[in-house]
From Swiss-Prot:
The organism's taxonomic lineage, starting at the top: Bacteria, Pseudomonadati, Pseudomonadota, Betaproteobacteria, Burkholderiales
One Pfam family per UniProt: Semialdhyde_dhC_1
Reactions this protein catalyses: N-acetyl-L-glutamate 5-semialdehyde + phosphate + NADP(+) = N-acetyl-L-glutamyl 5-phosphate + NADPH + H(+)
Name used for this protein in its record: N-acetyl-gamma-glutamyl-phosphate reductase
Enzyme active site: C117
Amino acid sequence: MSLPIVYIDGDQGTTGLQIHERLRDRTDLRLVTLPDAERKDPARRAEAINASDIAILCLPDAAAREAVGFIRNPAVRVIDASSAHRTEPDWVYGFPEMVDGHAQTIAHARRVTNPGCYPTGAVGLLRPLQQAGLLPRDYPVCIHAVSGYSGGGRAAVDAFESNGAARAQPLQVYGLALAHKHVPEIQLHAGLAHRPLFVPAYGAYRQGIVLTVPIELRLLPAGVTGEALHACLAHHYAGARRVEVTPLADTRAITHLDPQALNGSNDLRLSVFVNAEHGQVLLAAVFDNLGKGASGAAVQNLDLMLGVASAVKAA
């Protein structure tokens, strides 16, 4: 039996390079790359896409849409790491742990859209609570996140690392027009009735995200407690190898969250911090924006689509 052919369109960008690194030594697939002189040639790209079993698109949004338009072979399956198709109804959202049975949906999908880095944390925290009826659909959600500068792509990495840390701003809050491209994705896949207010920032470190969502218990259905929110998340992700929920007792000893704690992994760590006296809760997610927030998630979805036993069991 021949090995499945995987082609990465855009393997010189931040995410593409990471995916290539994760796949290059695999013996259960054939990884196809184009020579440097051909990797931007539309005709050669189209040929490589149509000759592949699974094409992984690591491109800007417009180029990703163009690449999908190249497809003439109906057998070609696609994982799109851009944000071009994340709210499209005919694409499967590539977050295996999001709802029960979703890993199998991904495994059989023709078109999978990889989640954005920030939505990975936000949807991971909010979707189970909304689905369980603990978080009303019309709750006024506010999200704050700090990412390593690699979240800005290869240009941001090159700019920061050529200037050096000594001259870098320690924190850059951006998206001040409150129109970040991830907002519609978060709203849709978290099941929210209204746009969340999202404030992102880049820190002066390469990779890793801390994302937080404050919750006022008085705005939730009567009787919902911080303990109930935690129990919901713990139950939802029980058995998920790539998502862990910090035991509630352990959060009382945590004084800070390190955005780099899970760098190099494909893991997502969720925590619930409770101030029962004042009726306030802080939901928090820590993960690698280049791991579970990008390349790691793409490889996890690829493994599901290829039927890799360990991936199916883990999800």
